[in-house]
Design a protein with these regions (language model features):
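Histidine-acidic metal/acid-base catalytic patches
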Residues: 5-191
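Active-site segments of SGNH/GDSL-like serine hydrolases
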Residues: 1-2
Length: 191
């Protein structure tokens, strides 16, 4: 869940007040997407999503924000999406693509500043490792640099979620993606 979600905020308040070594955070790096995951885009494109909806979402990321924040700024009360996006939605696939796009956040790394002492674990979310050995949507080089500078001294695991977007009759490359992610982590950690 997002750091601005009321349930997350309630948990954070309890965590801080109790200051127990048994309460902490597991941060999901999916909150640091720089781009919409390409595997999701390709999957919805395969299903027939309107290319204009796809481009609309890509433009939001390219502008330096994410759909969740952009929609919150542009929406009129009672509407899920801005009017210009609603006009482009022609099918359930378009609607789902736009709705799910709000789950890929572009948070500033410093959102973690006050929580570093409470972070017990990092879920290194990956959707697609490229041939160049980097995650397509998330800059792990930047994430790890931030965590090092902030004093984080815990674990980063690999959480592969690209499998949910694999096209029919295509192999799920889960092992290959996890291995590539672990190699990338070692490289950025200097191991």
């Amino acid at each position: 869940m997002s750091f601005d979600d009321p349930l997350t905020q309630a948990y954070l308040n309890v965590m801080k007040k109790s200051n127990s070594p048994y309460l902490g955070l597991t941060v999901d790096t999916g909150i640091f997407c720089k781009r919409h995951p390409r595997v999701s885009t390709n999957y919805f494109r395969f299903l027939g999503a309107n290319e204009e909806v796809i481009q609309y979402i890509d433009h939001i990321f390219a502008s330096g924000t994410d759909p969740k924040r952009y929609f919150a700024e542009k929406n009129q009360e009672g509407q899920m999406f801005p009017e210009e996006l609603q006009a482009l939605i022609r099918s359930n696939h378009d609607f789902e693509y736009a709705m799910f796009s709000t789950g890929y956040e572009m948070s500033d790394y410093h959102i973690l500043d006050e929580y570093i002492p409470y972070i017990k674990h990092i879920h290194g979310k990956i959707y697609e490792m490229t041939e160049e050995g980097v995650e397509y949507s998330i800059s792990f080089e930047e994430v790890i640099e931030y965590l090092k500078n902030a004093g984080y001294d815990g674990y980063i695991s690999t959480e592969y979620e690209g499998n949910r977007f694999e096209l029919p009759d295509h192999p799920i490359r889960d092992k290959e993606n996890v291995i590539a992610h672990q190699r990338m982590l070692k490289k950025y950690l200097g191991e």
